[in-house]
Regions:
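Bacterial N-terminal signal peptides
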Residues: 8-19
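Short, composition-biased motifs enriched in small/polar/acidic residues
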Residues: 20-98
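A sequence-level/structural motif corresponding to short, flexible coil/turn segments enriched
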Residues: 98-475
Length: 475
């Protein structure tokens, strides 16, 4: 009893000292329910959102859950790792919305410009971004790893030379990265062929480089780890080789062993022109991407496959004009979130986001854009990445700006010609919780991807003509 009482007293003190960042609240009761669960009661207001944060060292707090106040006292059960209840600290706060950036870092490669496509929040607390440096066709894959404070840990480039060839080759593409126990796997292309590159976690040095000629100009876009190795998706027979986002090819899926050797594959061309993302849910594979419809416009495409790649079902989403699907993530309950941008039912390109259940049945869809209030005829809002959030909603990133020489407008400190990072947070039922834009002191920014960090915040991959890293705190 004395140990539990002391822990409850310590939690109470921590709350009083550290809750000043949001609306102050007080933990009034604390109880260990079981070795892996605690119960916290705190002062609250009905209907107000509160974040319950936990820490092992009083330095780094992460969001454990978000609850709505039920009156002047709210009680919540919180899961904690078994064996850590004696050395676990808690605090309660109201969310700070929209969040103010903690830091921004920018790093480049050997090329004049560098463009990131994917960002990963790593198990060690750091972040890893991949993309290319240079301009097509003479690009090299670039990977940059930072620690949790934004300090550079390593930077590596990969090309045809990484395979042992004498030249760098062309059309080297870094499309995404996957973390496994002992390494990172980069999915992309080397010298016009699909590539899987296994790199050392500590240095980024390539340990294995596997290239597969799957047909014409081809590439892997994304990978997922399975019991038998890896499954990669991408495209073959690209018609637009100068486009790193949609190459107008044929969707493709490949099975790789743990060493990256291809053991099988199948075309997805009947369902997807380009397979862009893959995720695993139980024993099934969920694949998203872009598909041509009967009117020769693009729609969101979604597939559920068995573990052997056989088709379970396919879904199409979109309207009368182009709908470009680039981001996908799965919630803890198997819910599927898709994002991209659309011209269907909009004045110009706007973000297009939807939530589906695990059977691919639409739960809600939202179109949103022009957050700075310019003439919508000239504004592009282009979304590239989405992440499911613990509350059952999602957060996405985009770029917002205009590309028209005939139009330029200034509203306050915002200029339409200057692109900015655009972030949108939706709740479980699709309600807008907050949105924000983030701008450079000079030049353009655009959000390319994002990941949820271990402290409950977000890291955003920013196109700033280099690899930009924008860190937002817990939201």
């Amino acid at each position: 009893m004395s140990r539990i009482f002391l822990q409850g007293l310590l939690v109470f003190t921590v709350c009083l000292v550290l809750s000043s960042a949001g609306r102050t609240t007080e933990i009034t009761e604390f109880r260990v329910v079981s070795p892996g669960e605690v119960e916290i009661t705190f002062t609250s207001d009905a209907g107000v959102l509160y974040d319950v944060l936990g820490s092992e060292d009083l330095r780094n707090f992460s969001v454990l859950t978000r609850v709505s106040g039920s009156g002047d006292r709210t009680r919540v059960a919180v899961q904690v790792p078994v064996g850590q209840t004696e050395r676990r600290f808690f605090r309660i706060r109201t969310p700070q919305l929209p969040p103010t950036p903690e830091w921004f870092r920018s790093y480049g490669g050997s090329g004049e410009e560098s463009h990131g496509h994917y960002i990963l929040a790593c198990e060690d607390g750091g972040v890893l971004q991949v993309g290319e440096t240079g301009f097509l066709p003479n690009t090299r894959i670039l990977a940059i790893k930072l620690d949790q404070e934004g300090r550079l840990e390593w930077r590596q480039e990969y090309s045809n030379r990484t395979t042992g060839a004498s030249g760098h080759g062309t059309y080297n593409l870094g499309n995404s990265v996957l973390e496994v126990d002992e390494a990172y796997w980069i999915a992309g292309a080397i010298n016009r062929n699909s590539a899987a590159i296994k790199v050392n976690k500590g240095t980024g040095e390539a340990e294995l480089v596997k290239t597969h000629s799957n047909g014409g100009y081809d590439a892997y876009e994304h990978m997922v780890e399975t019991d038998g190795g890896l499954v990669a998706v991408g495209y073959t027979n690209a018609e637009d080789r100068e486009n790193t986002f949609f190459a107008e090819g044929r969707g493709y899926l490949a099975f790789l062993d743990p060493e990256g050797n291809k053991t099988g594959g199948r075309s997805l061309r009947d369902d997807l022109a380009q397979a862009y993302r893959i995720a695993k849910h139980e024993q099934a594979l969920i694949v998203s991407g872009l598909v041509w419809n009967e009117d020769d416009n693009l729609d969101f495409g979604l597939l559920k496959l068995n573990a052997d790649g056989s088709r379970v079902w396919g879904r199409l989403f979109g309207g009368a004009r182009d709908d470009h699907c680039f981001g996908m993530d799965l919630g803890a309950d198997g819910s599927i979130f898709l994002t991209g941008h659309t011209l269907s039912g909009t004045i110009n390109w706007q973000t297009y986001t939807m939530k589906l259940d695990h059977d691919g049945i639409l739960q809600w869809e939202r179109k949103r854009g022009n957050p700075r209030g310019f003439d919508p005829r000239f504004i592009h809002d282009e979304a590239w990445g989405v992440r499911a959030t613990p509350d059952g909603g999602c957060i996405l990133t985009a770029g917002t700006g205009d590309e028209y020489g005939s139009y330029s407008e200034t509203i306050g400190s915002h200029v339409s010609d200057q692109w900015e990072v655009y972030v949108i947070k939706y709740g479980p039922e699709g309600g807008l919780e907050w949105e924000a834009t983030y701008e450079a002191e000079e030049g353009d920014w655009a959000g390319e991807d994002l990941a949820l960090t271990r402290d409950g915040g977000v890291i955003i991959a920013v196109d700033s003509s280099q690899f930009g890293f924008l860190k937002l705190p817990s939201f």
